[in-house]
């Protein structure tokens, strides 16, 4: 993906969610909720503070994050793939291996 995030923006590719229940039933429609985990594809330079300094972001390319999938998260097709553009504050946690 050839894209660069600006300022405190993060671009995330949503991870696929399991479409079968523990009992092997295939989930469809509203039962198959969208995943709120994804891989960070690009990050901006950081948040610009009131004093003009730039605070680097806590996430880096390749991190797996849990994110808030609500207002302010923009879905965009980039190179025929869905990518989510969000503020770094929409990321709730980094999943560590």
UniProtKB/Swiss-Prot annotation:
Q: What's any GO biological process attached to this entry?
A: chaperone cofactor-dependent protein refolding
- Gene Ontology cellular component annotations, sorted alphabetically: cytoplasm
Q: What is its main location?
A: cytoplasm
A GO molecular function held by the record: ATP binding
Q: Which Pfam families did the record assign?
A: Cpn10
Q: Which domain of life does the UniProt lineage start with?
A: Bacteria
The record's section on InterPro entries has: Chaperonin_GroES, Chaperonin_GroES_sf, GroES-like_sf
Q: Which UniProt keywords apply?
A: Chaperone, Cytoplasm
Q: Report the locations given in the UniProt record.
A: Cytoplasm
Q: What is known about what this protein does?
A: Together with the chaperonin GroEL, plays an essential role in assisting protein folding. The GroEL-GroES system forms a nano-cage that allows encapsulation of the non-native substrate proteins and provides a physical environment optimized to promote and accelerate protein folding. GroES binds to the apical surface of the GroEL ring, thereby capping the opening of the GroEL channel.
Family of this protein:
Belongs to the GroES chaperonin family.
Give the quaternary structure. Heptamer of 7 subunits arranged in a ring. Interacts with the chaperonin GroEL.
Q: What protein name does the entry list?
A: Co-chaperonin GroES
Q: Which organism is it from?
A: Stenotrophomonas maltophilia
């Amino acid at each position: 993906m050839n894209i660069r995030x600006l300022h405190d923006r993060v671009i995330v590719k949503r991870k696929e969610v399991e479409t079968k229940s523990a009992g092997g039933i295939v989930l469809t429609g509203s039962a198959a909720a969208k995943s709120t985990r994804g891989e960070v594809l690009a990050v901006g330079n950081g948040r610009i503070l009131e004093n003009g300094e730039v605070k680097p972001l806590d996430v880096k390319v390749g991190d797996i994050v849990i994110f808030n999938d609500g207002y302010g998260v923009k879905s965009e097709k980039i190179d025929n793939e869905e990518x989510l553009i969000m503020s770094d504050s929409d990321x709730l946690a980094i999943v560590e291996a």
